[in-house]
Amino acid sequence: MAGTGKTVTRVDLCEAVYQKVGLSRTESSAFVELVLKEITDCLERGETVKLSSFGSFMVRKKGQRIGRNPKTGTEVPISPRRVMVFKPSAILKQRINGQQANGKMNGESAPSEFSAETE
């Protein structure tokens, strides 16, 4: 599943569970579907879904406001609605930016406590 520009699908997630966990393909598919359904159900109820070291999915209410049609410039009322928001954890942000949890770039060695400088 690694790579740039690739979209990961349910099938990809099921295959990863199959390869890494050892469940059958049918069980892997059922497992992924169950997890996604549970997340969806929680969000539908307005609950926040917090996944440690990954991030939080939450539902926010947006009030009614006036928007503008970009083609005509006409003002258009936008109805109140709920939107889903994802807030990544600090750990996920660091990993995406190629950093380890200690703030170092991946591949950089951490300074040794016992290194001595000679002049």
From Swiss-Prot:
Region (Disordered): 96-119
GO biological process terms held by the UniProt record: DNA recombination; positive regulation of metabolic process; regulation of DNA-templated transcription; regulation of translation
Keyword Plastid: no
Pfam families in the cross-refs: Bac_DNA_binding
InterPro entries attached to this UniProt entry: Hist_DNA-bd, Histone-like_DNA-bd_CS, IHF-like_DNA-bd_dom_sf, IHF_alpha
Gene3D superfamilies: IHF-like DNA-binding proteins
PROSITE patterns: HISTONE_LIKE
Alphabetic keyword roster: DNA recombination, DNA-binding, Transcription, Transcription regulation, Translation regulation
Subunit structure comment from the entry: Heterodimer of an alpha and a beta chain.
Entry similarity comment: Belongs to the bacterial histone-like protein family.
Name listed for the protein in its UniProt record: Integration host factor subunit alpha
Originating species: Bradyrhizobium sp. (strain ORS 278)
Primary gene name: ihfA
